Amino acid sequence: MSPRKFFVGGNWKMNGDKKSLGELINTLNSGKMNADTEVVCGAPAIYLDFARQKLDAKIALSAQNCYKVAKGAFTGEISPAMIKDCGATWVILGHSERRHVFGECDELIGQKVAHALSEGIGVIACIGEKLDQREAGITEKVVFEQTKAIADNVKDWSKVVLAYEPVWAIGTGKTATPEQAQEVHKKLREWVKTNVSEGVAQSVRIIYGGSVTGGTCRELAGQPDIDGFLVGGASLKPEFIEIINAKH
């Protein structure tokens, strides 16, 4: 059996209000969840406090982004210190929407990772290729470059989860086949073994994101190098509980 604790993160993105998120949280709190799975919900920054007050202690809270310094004249940004102050213990960094909609580069993402970890926040670090990159046969090159920019900024890997999300499968309804996902996860683990250490390669959780649903989660969860999921749209629905229990 894998010594790695299964990890399921829900990324609510820019969705919900107090009413709908409150209802979702009630559903999650009363749902039966596999105790061997680590569960984290990524709320919009403005609702972090609200979510932490309502979520059961068994469910951790994540921010969806943060900046690379603790405070200052950075209008519209939030810092890991603020995230911690709201009771959140994780942050999602390098999500494909941050990279491709907001133009964040590998270097900036690396700096954010370093600062969040230095403040004691866990990082869900996202990597993944676009459709044209997969079709050009450069998936590994792209994903390894993104991973290197993150790895160069990590001293303690115990607080890092790597999330592989093929960009072409996010919100498109296209899912990588379990075999396609496993292939990239396996190569990522080999990259970590070669470039970081064998110990980290065996312990780091590499989770999959990209149109994960109640219907696709079990077969994906059965792959040896898939240690969980980062779930988008389905994390706003009751089926999120099915996904949490994919390993059950």
UniProtKB/Swiss-Prot annotation:
Q: Where is the active site?
A: H95, E165
Documented EC number(s)? 5.3.1.1, 4.2.3.3
- Reactions that this protein is recorded to catalyse: dihydroxyacetone phosphate = methylglyoxal + phosphate; D-glyceraldehyde 3-phosphate = dihydroxyacetone phosphate
Keywords annotated in UniProt: Cytoplasm, Gluconeogenesis, Glycolysis, Isomerase, Lyase
Question: By which gene is this protein encoded?
Answer: tpi1
A Pfam family this protein belongs to? TIM
UniProt key word Endoplasmic reticulum:
no
What are the annotated GO cellular component locations?
Answer: cytosol
As for subcellular location, the record says: Cytoplasm
The pathway to which it is assigned is: Carbohydrate degradation; glycolysis; D-glyceraldehyde 3-phosphate from glycerone phosphate: step 1/1; Carbohydrate biosynthesis; gluconeogenesis
Q: How does it assemble?
A: Homodimer.
Protein residues bound to substrate: N11, K13
Supply the source organism for this entry. Xenopus laevis (African clawed frog)
Q: What does this protein do?
A: Triosephosphate isomerase is an extremely efficient metabolic enzyme that catalyzes the interconversion between dihydroxyacetone phosphate (DHAP) and D-glyceraldehyde-3-phosphate (G3P) in glycolysis and gluconeogenesis. It is also responsible for the non-negligible production of methylglyoxal a reactive cytotoxic side-product that modifies and can alter proteins, DNA and lipids.
Protein name as annotated: Triosephosphate isomerase
Q: Does the keyword Lyase apply?
A: yes
Spell out the molecular function terms from Gene Ontology: methylglyoxal synthase activity; protein homodimerization activity; triose-phosphate isomerase activity
Q: Which domain of life is it from?
A: Eukaryota
- InterPro entries the record matches: Aldolase_TIM, TIM_sf, TrioseP_Isoase_bac/euk, Triosephosphate_isomerase, Triosephosphate_isomerase_AS
Query: A single GO BP annotation from the record?
Result: glycerol catabolic process
The entry assigns this protein to a family as follows: Belongs to the triosephosphate isomerase family.
